[in-house]
């Protein structure tokens, strides 16, 4: 069978031309050879960690109907008797090819992309919840999975590969979705997974240190995030103007053919670039308790107040970002506020367990220096409020932190994590996170380099660390279990073992409870 090649990297018309050259009926595209079924069309890209062209014999054996393969540095073997097409730069073209094959699903969805170091998951989930409350069926794709609020399926990556992403959008469109919100990770943006998707709204939460093992520098990391805001056809850019990158982007986008909604609490009017395409959502009078966040908002000379049953100071920024995204989605301010009042806490994001006659235990995904600083600062402020109202057995309540760092990731942040934990918590236990292929003890030692004081100890076994932290706490204390959030596995030496911080916490609290006590949360 004849093999054809293409060197062009152009628009969707070229994608259609490529599929026509293949001369087979493409019903189901797959880029992951492990998921191939008879009749599928296989896209064999040359990835950074895995070259899928090595899987071509396996794909043929599985009964695929054709193969599109990366042409550069590879030759098709004559014994492979199957329709095929060699394409130079296939990773860049994959999303456009898949979009063409699945009927350009993003054109028929209001597509919202959320990027930033922290807050992507919470913002995407809350946007989907709020839109659902407004009667607009909205799908969501991200760290917690993909699907619809309350019915998510596990995801291997925060941002799926370009082919699977187009398939998911087509499925959600078929299921009646009118909108889709997704987390746009820096890896996904750098690896062209979003090409072929037509975004209506792009949202920036923040930019702090993370993934420097991949991006090498903060400038490269910021550049990856910024790509989303220069997306062809983008209608709205929602920017955090309390962030340096947000201000820079607002200045670069001023006068462009799109609308900007800047948001913030720190007088964003003063930092915003004056331009006809920019509006400001300003939050003020922020108040929070252990149960609720409240603040006032101003937008285009309209005023409203928002109270929401979530906790954590940084969640105020998440709420403001989601409100701005709803406004960009043509939702009236009052309707958006009403919908946001109904959002629910996200699993593993400031998830509260215990309380009552037991210590309060918070499970959170915070795994970057900035996120840990924000969470501990907020909990410290909450604890201070508790101390003002009452004393616990004549002694002040404590803030206890269990934290670790992942293996095979940015080593430079490890001592920073240790420093922040030791400065803001009364007791710290440094433990394992996902050690992956590293020795957990070595990771802990690097975290401990930044920690100081006798209140900082270590425990390699994460379960033992959680037990020790909660057993050492009393009624009125707060215990933060940070780093893994709602993850349901722990990766050790290339294997993933079932593990859930929340289940461990529930078991400890159950063991501690007397016959008359019930675990709360």
Curated annotation (Swiss-Prot):
Its main location: cytoplasm. It is an enzyme of class 6 (ligase). Pathway: Cell wall biogenesis; peptidoglycan biosynthesis. One of its GO terms (cellular component) is cytoplasm. It catalyses: UDP-N-acetyl-alpha-D-muramoyl-L-alanyl-D-glutamate + meso-2,6-diaminopimelate + ATP = UDP-N-acetyl-alpha-D-muramoyl-L-alanyl-gamma-D-glutamyl-meso-2,6-diaminopimelate + ADP + phosphate + H(+). Its cofactor is Mg(2+). It is found in: Cytoplasm. Meso-2,6-diaminopimelate binds at residues 409, 433-436, 483, 487. Its EC number is 6.3.2.13. GO terms for biological process: cell division; cell wall organization; peptidoglycan biosynthetic process; regulation of cell shape. UDP-N-acetyl-alpha-D-muramoyl-L-alanyl-D-glutamate binds at residues 33, 158-159, 185, 191, 193. Keywords: ATP-binding, Cell cycle, Cell division, Cell shape, Cell wall biogenesis/degradation, Cytoplasm, Ligase, Magnesium, Nucleotide-binding, Peptidoglycan synthesis. The modification N6-carboxylysine is found at residue 225. InterPro entries: Mur-like_cat_sf, Mur_ligase_C, Mur_ligase_C_dom_sf, Mur_ligase_cen, MurE/MurF_N, UDP-N-AcMur-Glu-dNH2Pim_ligase. GO terms for molecular function: ATP binding; magnesium ion binding; UDP-N-acetylmuramoylalanyl-D-glutamate-2,6-diaminopimelate ligase activity. A motif (Meso-diaminopimelate recognition motif) lies at residues 433-436. ATP binds at residues 116-122. Carboxylation is probably crucial for Mg(2+) binding and, consequently, for the gamma-phosphate positioning of ATP. Catalyzes the addition of meso-diaminopimelic acid to the nucleotide precursor UDP-N-acetylmuramoyl-L-alanyl-D-glutamate (UMAG) in the biosynthesis of bacterial cell-wall peptidoglycan. Belongs to the MurCDEF family. MurE subfamily. This is UDP-N-acetylmuramoyl-L-alanyl-D-glutamate--2,6-diaminopimelate ligase. It comes from Nitrosomonas europaea (strain ATCC 19718 / CIP 103999 / KCTC 2705 / NBRC 14298).
